[in-house]
C-alpha cells in the first residue's frame, strides 16, 4: 500500500519544539487557566497569545475547537494552531476523540503545509476502550486519509499535489511509547487501506473492469507472504453452478469474475472470518435501465469490492494472527441482446431459483452465489459489503451505513467496531414479516420485495447465509461522496479493519 506521508511519534521533540523548523505547529490545550508545559512555552514565545485568547473568551478549549495565533521570531513554525481538548478531569468520549482527530487533521491540511508537529496534553478518557493509543489511531487514520489525492487519469500539468509530507506527534501520556506507536501505525495503515479503496472506486468504468479488480487483487497478494489469491472465470463459475452471478454480466462484453483472497495469519486449520464484496464495476441497471442523470456515479457500484480488497491488504500489513477470506463477486451490468430480462428465472449455486423482476437489483444476485461459495471455508462469521439500495440513503442519509444480521452478537461487534473506528453503522430489523415480500409465483424467491427496500434486499441475502453468522452492510450512502467532493470515501474499510483487529 502507498504511504502518502511520514507519520511518527517523537516524544523527544518536546525539548526543542520551538526551534524545529516546520510549516505548522498544532498545540492541544485543555480547558482552564493552567497550560501544560508545551503550551506554556508556546504562550511565552508568542507574547502570551494563548492566555490572551482564553482571557478574552475567544478560545475556550472546548473539544475540537480551533484557533490561529500569529507567529514571531520566538518560534520556527510558519503557522500555529490551537485545538481544544476539553476539561482535563472529565473523561473524553469516543466522539470527543473523533473531534480532536478531525481538528488536528484540518489544521495540518488547511494551508499548503509540508511538515507539521502536533503536541497533545494529558487527557482523561471516559472508558477503558478510549485511550491515548485510541486517539493516535484515529489521528493516524484521519491524517493519512486526508492526504489522499486522485490523479491517476490526469494530465501531468493538472496533477494534484499532496503537500503534507511529514508529521511528528508529541503527547503527554502515561501509556507506553510502544502502545502509542502501535496505535499511530495501526491508524495510518487503516488510512492507507481507505486510500486503496478510493483509488479503485475513482477509476472510470472503462478501466476498472472485473478483470482489473482481479489483476489488482493478484498484485496485492504478491506483496504479502501470507496472502494468496485465486480468480474464477465464467467457465469455472458455470461449472460451480453460479448462474445467478453470471446472469448479471450476460449483456456485457466484460467477463465476470469471482475473486477469492486468502490471508493465513492464524494457525493452520483455524476457521477464518470472511468478508464478501459486491463488485459491479458499472451498473446501467441492465434492461431495467437507470435514468441518465448521475449514471456516471454507477462506477462506484464496486465500492463493496474495493473495501474487501483494501481490508485484506490492511490485515496483511498489520500481520493479524487470524485467518481471513475476502471474496469479490464482480460483473458489469449492461443492456444488450444477451442481457437478462425482467421475468427471467435463474438457478443459484445453492440450488434455489430466483425470478429477476428488476435487473437493476443485481447486486444481491452476485452476492447470493458468493455467499454460497464461502460456505466451503466454514467461516466463523461472514460480513458482506455492498452499495445495495438507494433506500438506505432515504433511511440513514450519507453518514451512516445500514447493518442487518442474523446474529445479534455479530451485529453488536460490528456496531462497536464502527464506533471505535469513527465509521458508524445503524442496525435495521431483519424480521420474518419482511420475508414474505419476496414470494414469487414462478421461482423460489423474487429479487425485489416491498417498500422497505433495504430490509427486503437483506432478507434476500439472508436466504443464502443460513449456515453461518452473517451480517450485511449497505454502504450505498457512505462509500462515496456526492457533489463537488465526488469520489470514493474509503468506507467501510475502518469498520471492517477494526472488527478484524478486535477478533485477533
For each feature predicted by the language model, list its residue ranges:
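Short amphipathic alpha-helical segment within the helicase RecA-like ATPase core
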Residues: 1-279
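A generic structural signal for tightly packed, nonpolar segments enriched in small/aliphatic residues
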Residues: 58, 115, 197, 213-504
Amino acid at each position: 500500500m502507498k504511504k502518502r506521508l511520514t507519520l511518527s511519534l517523537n516524544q523527544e521533540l518536546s525539548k526543542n519544539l520551538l526551534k524545529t523548523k516546520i510549516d505548522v505547529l498544532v498545540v492541544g490545550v485543555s480547558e482552564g487557566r493552567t497550560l501544560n508545559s508545551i503550551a506554556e512555552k508556546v504562550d511565552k514565545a508568542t507574547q502570551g497569545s494563548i492566555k490572551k485568547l482564553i482571557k478574552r473568551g475567544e478560545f475556550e478549549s472546548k473539544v475540537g475547537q480551533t484557533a490561529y495565533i500569529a507567529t514571531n521570531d520566538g518560534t520556527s513554525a510558519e503557522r500555529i494552531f490551537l485545538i481544544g481538548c476539553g476539561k482535563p478531569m472529565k473523561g473524553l468520549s469516543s466522539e470527543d476523540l473523533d473531534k480532536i482527530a478531525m481538528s488536528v487533521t484540518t489544521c495540518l491540511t488547511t494551508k499548503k503545509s509540508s511538515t507539521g508537529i502536533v503536541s497533545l496534553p494529558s487527557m482523561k478518557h471516559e472508558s477503558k476502550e478510549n485511550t491515548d493509543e485510541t486517539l493516535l489511531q484515529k489521528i493516524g487514520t484521519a491524517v493519512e486519509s486526508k492526504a489522499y489525492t486522485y490523479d491517476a487519469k490526469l494530465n501531468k500539468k493538472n496533477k494534484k499535489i499532496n503537500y503534507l509530507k511529514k508529521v511528528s506527534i508529541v503527547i503527554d501520556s502515561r501509556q507506553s511509547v510502544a502502545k502509542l506507536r502501535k496505535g499511530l501505525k495501526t491508524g495510518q495503515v487503516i488510512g492507507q487501506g481507505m486510500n486503496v479503496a478510493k483509488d479503485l472506486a475513482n477509476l472510470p468504468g472503462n478501466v476498472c473492469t472485473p478483470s482489473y479488480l482481479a489483476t489488482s487483487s493478484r498484485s496485492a497478494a504478491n506483496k504479502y507472504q501470507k496472502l494468496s489469491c485465486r480468480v474464477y472465470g465464467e467457465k469455472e463459475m458455470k461449472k460451480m453452478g453460479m448462474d445467478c452471478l453470471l446472469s448479471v454480466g450476460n449483456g456485457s462484453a466484460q467477463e465476470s469474475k469471482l475473486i477469492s483472497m486468502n490471508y493465513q495469519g492464524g494457525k493452520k486449520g483455524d476457521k477464518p472470518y470472511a468478508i464478501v464484496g459486491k463488485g459491479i464495476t458499472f451498473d446501467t441497471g441492465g434492461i431495467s435501465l437507470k435514468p441518465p442523470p448521475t449514471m456516471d456515479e454507477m462506477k462506484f457500484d464496486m465500492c463493496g469490492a474495493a473495501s474487501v480488497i483494501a481490508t485484506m491488504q490492511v490485515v496483511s500489513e498489520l500481520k493479524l494472527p487470524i485467518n481471513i477470506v475476502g471474496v469479490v463477486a464482480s460483473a458489469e451490468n449492461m443492456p444488450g441482446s444477451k442481457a437478462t430480462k425482467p421475468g427471467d428465472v435463474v438457478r443459484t449455486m445453492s440450488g434455489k431459483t430466483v425470478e429477476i423482476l428488476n435487473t437493476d437489483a443485481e447486486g444481491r444476485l452476485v452476492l447470493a452465489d458468493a455467499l454460497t461459495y464461502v460456505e466451503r471455508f466454514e467461516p466463523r462469521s461472514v460480513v458482506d459489503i455492498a452499495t445495495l439500495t438507494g433506500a438506505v440513503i432515504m433511511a440513514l442519509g450519507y453518514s451512516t451505513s445500514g447493518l442487518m444480521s442474523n446474529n445479534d452478537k455479530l451485529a453488536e461487534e460490528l456496531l462497536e467496531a464502527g464506533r471505535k473506528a469513527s465509521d458508524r453503522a445503524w442496525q435495521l430489523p431483519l424480521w420474518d414479516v419482511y420475508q414474505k415480500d419476496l414470494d414469487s409465483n414462478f421461482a423460489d424467491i423474487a429479487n425485489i420485495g416491498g417498500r422497505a427496500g433495504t430490509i427486503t434486499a437483506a432478507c434476500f441475502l439472508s436466504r443464502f447465509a443460513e449456515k453461518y453468522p452473517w451480517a450485511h452492510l449497505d454502504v450505498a450512502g457512505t462509500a462515496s461522496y456526492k457533489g463537488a467532493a465526488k469520489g470514493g470515501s474509503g468506507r467501510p474499510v475502518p469498520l471492517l479493519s477494526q472488527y478484524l483487529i478486535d477478533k485477533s
